[in-house]
Amino acid sequence: MAHPHLLAERISRLSSSLEKGLYERSHAIRLCLLAALSGESVFLLGPPGIAKSLIARRLKFAFQNARAFEYLMTRFSTPEEVFGPLSIQALKDEGRYERLTSGYLPEAEIVFLDEIWKAGPAILNTLLTAINERQFRNGAHVEKIPMRLLVAASNELPEADSSLEALYDRMLIRLWLDKVQDKANFRSMLTSQQDENDNPVPDALQVTDEEYERWQKEIGEITLPDHVFELIFMLRQQLDKLPDAPYVSDRRWKKAIRLLQASAFFSGRSAVAPVDLILLKDCLWYDAQSLNLIQQQIDVLMTGHAWQQQGMLTRLGAIVQRHLQLQQQQSDKTALTVIRLGGIFSRRQQYQLPVNVTASTLTLLLQKPLKLHDMEVVHISFERSALEQWLSKGGEIRGKLNGIGFAQKLNLEVDSTQHLVVRDVSLQGSTLALPGSSAEGLPGEIKQQLEELESDWRKQHALFSEQQKCLFIPGDWLGRIEASLQDVGAQIRQAQQC
């Protein structure tokens, strides 16, 4: 692949030209362009009058000398209106059944079929062959067709278990469009004087036939790394477990991989990256319910696994637990000793916290773990004010077990050595101790593990920063991934400061 970054820049400029004068349609244009550049089909779902046909017409200008065909299907549409009329002369003179295809679908690079589900069986069967094999049987001859992009549109989905499902499955990219929402965009659309049929693409950006053919071969050379395959397989397994997940055929998975390869290729990369998998959100859904489900599952994949976010948090949790264990080993030295107050005539002994204990929230370590409220507890977090109240006046005391959840009622007492002791239901006790002072710093073992974890985090963040320059991925998805990585980084830095 020669000059990959120059190619990525060119495709970005080409897309920007195609998007001119279209409002809130950037994502649709970009995915239709990606589909056209990789020879795939697109289904646009949405109400009438939202520029579905204009999107298809614009894509014609992405290619030099491209021919376009568009047709509005009705229940009475005939194959002649889509594939061309019969040649009366050929039938009369030579007895040949042959269509005159000039100006019709078999000779067009860009095809737009509106109200696609109203097509009859004769049209649908021929269309399936055209999509699958890029061939058209014209009488006794089988002719190759130059179709690079089929855009089908409707304001409804095909009925389940109908004869239309086979065609629907061939439409790899599925986009649900709506009216222009933003006020400023709506005003600009109303006042725009641009002729929608003008060619907005400079000649230098248009794709030649030679480039298109060469790119098809080079797209197939883009590799699928093992770690990206594992993410895809994880998504597939998760969908198989969900009762409401849509059925995704092996054919659709395979075609989706080629789309991911094309995304990587036109982004200047030699391999598919995790960020490309976001495109699957527009490939795997079937209806409104599955659209939301697919997006949720891919969001979990991207923000939890694609850059090892969950794995790094699991490692961090293990390091924190190990740190607490090391601190527990030193708990005898740091056992919290409260101060006994005077009050000879007091009916209850009163205590107070040492003056050097000033934190608003105290995390106290158990000298030995206890099972409290059905949980193995190694440390308890107290609000300082609540603990001072209990030391002074007694009554009920609550704390967060292992620092999580709601504060739970505890059986806490002060022993004869003025140490705090917490007891379980069997009255086994464990002395509470202060964590090691920050002045001592982190143990070498913990410090090294955190440094290694931070190094791995930096590598993953750098990978994401490098891969996120992808024209075909919406910015809000990239923002959520960045936020998930920053959250992991913040937790690592917080642990390093303990």
Swiss-Prot record:
One Pfam family linked to the record: ATPase_RavA_C
Subcellular localization: Cytoplasm
A GO CC annotation given for this chain: cytoplasm
UniProt keyword annotation of Cytoplasm present: yes
EC number: 3.6.1.-
Family matches, as InterPro entries: AAA+_ATPase, ATPase_RavA, ATPase_RavA_C, MoxR, P-loop_NTPase, RavA-like_AAA_lid, RavA_ATPases, RavA_LARA_dom
Gene Ontology MF, one: ATP hydrolysis activity
Function: Component of the RavA-ViaA chaperone complex, which may act on the membrane to optimize the function of some of the respiratory chains. RavA functions as an ATPase.
Descriptive protein name: Regulatory ATPase RavA
Organism: Shigella boydii serotype 4 (strain Sb227)
Designated gene of the protein: ravA
